[in-house]
Amino acid sequence: MRKIILGALLATISLGAWAGENDQAGGSAWNRFLHGYRYYAHVGYHIGGTAPVGMPASIRTLHSYRLRPNFVLGVDAYHAISGRWGFVGGLHFEEKAMRTDAGVKGYHMRIVRGGEELEGVFTGSVVTKVDMSLITVPLQIAYDLSPHVRLKAGPYVSYVTSRKFEGWAYDGYLRRREEGHDKHDPTGQKVMLGHNDGERGNYDFSDDMRSWQMGIDVGADWYITKRWGAKAGLSWGLTGIFHSGFDTIEQTMYPIYGTIGVVYQLK
């Protein structure tokens, strides 16, 4: 992440130097560059979740999935490059959250019940609640398919301002990991987990989540009038939401969300 920030800083300095040379030569390229943008505001809703790519064998069924208030508000700037091609940069404020209830078998867990931490393989049901607030900067190449339709694709970087990953394991049993045994060994002490508070095992992995995320964002804008339009997109995280050393959940969990919304041209 430091290399990316440093690269962006060097690019900005180089662009500023280029603009300064042109101004000194009597041109106004920098002013033309700044005023050659069109600005857009948009509001939308994310539909998706945080999940591994490919369902692991230890997750047997999905009991329920609940939508959350995953709103996104942002401002984008578009700059024409050549012909139908252009560049889009933006600043987005996002919520990415989900709540799932899944049936698992032989699923590695670390939980707390009655103040005691337990680790082992669990068979039963697991509720997972994920909630992330993010500030996202997308950088996209745009192509105007027609005067009313614009396609966009490119990378994004997000800073996670608040994050939660918590839940509980219930209605099942945990084979407790014995000292010196592999964490997947299903022969340890059997600990029964019930349905209600005090009977189930809780977990909270919020402190193990990353502060920065990177991914790919693709989408399309369709303008119904000169200023108003509809938008749709897909953001796919390329970095997992947890730090690389976190191994309680063995599958890498990626934020994968589709977006629908409306867009308004400000200028």
Residue ranges of predicted features:
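Membrane-embedded beta-strand positions of outer-membrane beta-barrel proteins
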Residues: Y39-V43, G89-L91, L139, A153, ...
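Cleavable N-terminal export/targeting peptides
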Residues: M1-L34, K267
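Outer-membrane beta-barrel channels and translocator barrels
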Residues: L34, A80-S82, S146, T225-R227, ...
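Residue-level signature of outer-membrane beta-barrel architecture
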Residues: A77-H79, E95, Y143, Y159, ...
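Repeated loop/turn-to-beta-strand initiation elements of outer-membrane beta-barrel proteins
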Residues: R84-F87, H148-L151, K226-A232
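Extracellular/periplasm-exposed beta-strand and loop segments of Gram-negative cell-envelope proteins
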Residues: G49-R68, K96-S133, V160-Q213, G240-Y257
